[in-house]
Amino acid sequence: MNLKHENIHEYVIKCTNTTQITLDDDFNVMDSKPDIDLIVKEWGMAVVNGVKVNQDKAQIDGTLVFAIMYTGSSENDKRFIPVRMDGSLNFLENVNLSCDATGLDVNCKAQLEDLTIKSINSRKISVKAIVALTVTCEEIKNISISTGIEDGDCNAELLLKDFEYVQADVNMKDNLRIKETVSVPNGKADIGSLVWDDVDVRNVNTRMTEDGLSVSGELNVFIMYIADDEAGQVQWYETSTPFTGIIDVSGANPDGISYVGYNVISKNVEVRPDYDGNNRDVAVELVLDMDIKSYEECSRNAMWDMYIPGFDVDIKQETQQLKKLIIRNNNKCRVSGNVKVEDYINLMQIVNATANVQIDSYECIPEGIEIMGAVIVNIFYITSDDNSPMGSINSVIPFTTVVELKEYNKNLIEYTIRPSIEQLQASMNSSAQIEVKAVIALDTICFEPFNINVIDECECNKRENVDYSALPSMVGYISDGKCTVWDIAKKYDTTGNLMREENSTIQRLVDSDIIPAGTKLLLVRKAMV
């Protein structure tokens, strides 16, 4: 007997592995730059350049890009000035996989977990970093669901059940290039040379449209520069500017549930002349690596059972796993803490604050998913001390929050939570203490897998050596309260419709309903009708 089948497409993670690598190297200061007096700030970013797969091994080619700002002596008046130094460190790492990744979609995410840059002497620095490499191997799995039979003249009785599930209709990676320009306001001097920049992506919103994935957000831009005037004073400016972008997505569904992750893989900040020819414009160009997924909630009828009165039907069933969406939201968590300033620091003004979120653990509790982590904050300041005019403080502010879930099985759920800094503020409570306030966004999606038994194949044969004339055409039956309409109809070679026609007490029951205990029924065998 030929069955009708419909396919459901699922993206399945075959295997994943996370490994940590340690990078360590020394770098010399260029001859054109002054000696290092004190390292004030540091910045780093780990980028994956390519992934090569050989069966159960993945070779990761990547680069650690870093920069430091230090204070050095000016050649003219011997005063301390901020100086920037950039560098990069390439790495090649083999990651073992628990599956054969040949032919699979293999992706790698690099996360800089720790960066330590120290001066060995006034002309050399030591760079040490810990980078976490997470390799994920995915494949498309086609799940076949039987929905009926092809034989139109077959008098088969079908038990169809509705079920709801979610399937991924988009699973792709692409780059989003952001180009924005900010201008130094009136009252600030023209830019002579750019010393330092910090660019943070915040408040990112994504949604599927008919044109593709629409992305919007804010760029928080901070610059420090040497003024283009006789005094050559150090100046800084911080602002936010909105950005938008569109990524082409084949088969984009505006009603789809999008879940998008992003990671900065390239940053370029340049000073450009404005319309008057003065260096007052700053061009910011970022490249975001976008991990784009979109899900569709579906409802479908599946054939769970079948029989033909008067025939023996051999059914082969198969268990398939699907998943349903439990929650998709963006939780907010407020974090605050006080940072102690050492007594020897004559703090005069906070210049800039940057932060990132580090998650330490997830735990399923009755209320939902408990998240424990910390906000790693760096506060850049200036002092009233001419011998040490600027510096920065690193601090860790722990937090605990809960993503609420209702009626879930903690042993089954699959979830992804992407944390990011949405708001950050640092203010001086006193010369000895800085108050830090942050708002963390926890972009969350959670699924619960479930199994369904579907008919894969069936074979029917007419019963032989059965004398139907010797069998009663009608049977009296008293329900025990354990069987459904379908169970009884299948056992006694009748149909649910025929049972409802002959018995008014069950006219409102469907085939999958249990017949109440004590209900008296008259069953007419269809094979004898």
Language-model-detected regions and their locations in the chain:
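Primarily a LysM-type cell-wall glycan-binding module
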Residues: 462-501, 505-529
